[in-house]
Swiss-Prot record:
Homotetramer. It comes from the Bacteria. One of its GO terms (molecular function) is argininosuccinate synthase activity. It comes from Frankia alni (strain DSM 45986 / CECT 9034 / ACN14a). The gene is argG. This is Argininosuccinate synthase. Transmembrane segments: none annotated.
């Protein structure tokens, strides 16, 4: 029986060429799988047909936008996920859902291997292969671009030789990856960390320096997950899409950073994530209102580690499962509304409210009606500072 390989297919040059390369090098049949995570661009039916024309025995398109939002983006929001305190894990979140569908397709079609089009310098090769190892340890993984030394020129020559329906006449100066949660750009002039990004690199966001009439949005949350916008109940996928448009119109979510890649090198990355930055800003603010102080402090460390392990390709790991359990418990009761002003590249919180608010006006106010007994402060300070006071007395005794 002829072996089968399920290929993570994007419709671009590298993965289109990979179909023929896998057949030529291994003799295996290729099942192409394209997963829609809200990346937009070319029609997915056209991509499906291209895979068949390039030699795939079967070509599958999976609409995973809702699943991506509810099962991958929502946990990231609840975990305030920002790698290096800045990057909202745009690509990192989409890889594990693609891996999930690759493994499911491999089982359904009797494949004993999966393949991806990643290079050997990026993080995605790790995310794909470690994810497959976690979900299906017996599956082999092929990486044609990395393992065959397939340069762009070689790929073009391969495509032309076989008459593959790939337009290679137009080449973006940037390497782009995008999905519902945002857009990433690298390569070209962006590889110079001193060079200012040209405006043509930005698609999801308008120039934040151009004055516009500010917009105001109110985001509703239930147990830490966004559920409504301006009083309208929306699915998370719908809500993210609308915020990408509205916040993006004010230049919100542009990030220019030097990033520590998992493989050990630093890279310059340009991100556009209007909805992500708006939602993460709102969620963190609502947590400040609703979480008990020690839970909030501890959760900041959990959030940071959660972002790191997801960036590092460990979505399907026991540590992430354990952290998820804590985040689930901490998020219960993170309900309410956050109002934000969108202007000049910033999503600024201007109001928040919650039925579970821990803000007590009678304790916080300095005006009439203050119920805070300031006389209690003296005893509290004495006990709080007692260890320091005892230590200082010892130091003075030993070191007069």
């Amino acid at each position: 029986m002829t072996e089968r390989v399920v290929l993570a297919y994007s419709g671009g040059l590298d993965t289109s060429v990979a179909i023929g390369w896998i057949g030529a090098e291994t003799g295996a049949e290729v099942v192409a799988l394209a997963v829609d995570v809200g990346q937009g661009g070319e029609d997915l039916e056209a991509i499906r047909q291209r895979a068949l024309t390039c030699g795939a025995v079967e070509s599958i398109v999976v609409d995973a936008r809702t699943e991506f939002a509810e099962s991958f983006v929502a946990p990231a929001i609840r975990s305030n996920a920002l790698y290096m305190d800045r990057y909202p894990l745009i690509s990192s979140l989409s890889r594990p859902i693609i891996v999930k569908h690759l493994v499911e397709a491999a089982r359904e079609h009797g494949a004993d291997a999966i393949a991806h089009g990643c290079t050997g310098k990026g993080n995605d090769q790790v995310r794909f292969e470690v994810g497959v190892s976690a979900l299906a340890p017996g599956l082999k993984v092929l990486a044609p671009v990395r393992d065959s030394g397939m340069t762009r020129d070689k790929a073009i020559a391969f495509a032309e030789e076989r008459g593959l329906p790939i337009d290679v006449s137009k080449r973006s100066p940037y390497s782009i990856d995008q999905n519902l949660w945002g857009r990433t750009a690298e390569c070209g002039i962006l590889e110079d960390p001193w060079a200012q990004p040209p405006e043509d690199v930005f698609v999801y966001s308008a120039d934040p320096t151009v004055a516009r009439t500010p917009d105001e949005v109110t985001i509703s949350f239930t147990d830490g997950v966004p559920t409504g916008l301006d009083g309208r109940s929306l699915s998370l996928a719908e809500l993210v899409a609308e915020l990408n448009t509205r916040a993006g119109a004010h230049g919100v979510g542009r990030i220019d950073m030097i990033e520590d890649r998992l493989v050990g090198i630093k890279s310059r990355e340009i991100y556009e994530c209007p909805a992500a930055i708006t939602l993460l800003t709102a969620h963190r603010d609502l947590e400040d209102l609703t979480l008990e102080r020690d839970v909030a402090r501890f959760k900041r460390g959990v959030d940071q580690r959660w972002g790191e392990i997801v960036y590092d390709g460990l979505w399907y790991s026991p540590l992430k499962a354990a952290l998820d359990a804590f985040v689930d418990a901490a998020s219960a009761g993170v309900d309410g509304d956050v109002r934000l002003r969108l202007a000049g590249g910033v999503a600024q919180v201007v109001g928040r409210r919650s039925p579970g608010s821990l803000y007590d006006h009678a304790l916080a106010t300095y005006d009439a009606g203050d119920q805070f007994d300031q006389g209690d402060a003296r005893g509290f300070i004495e006990l709080w500072g007692l260890p320091t006071k005892v230590w200082a007395a010892r130091e003075q005794r030993l070191n007069p």
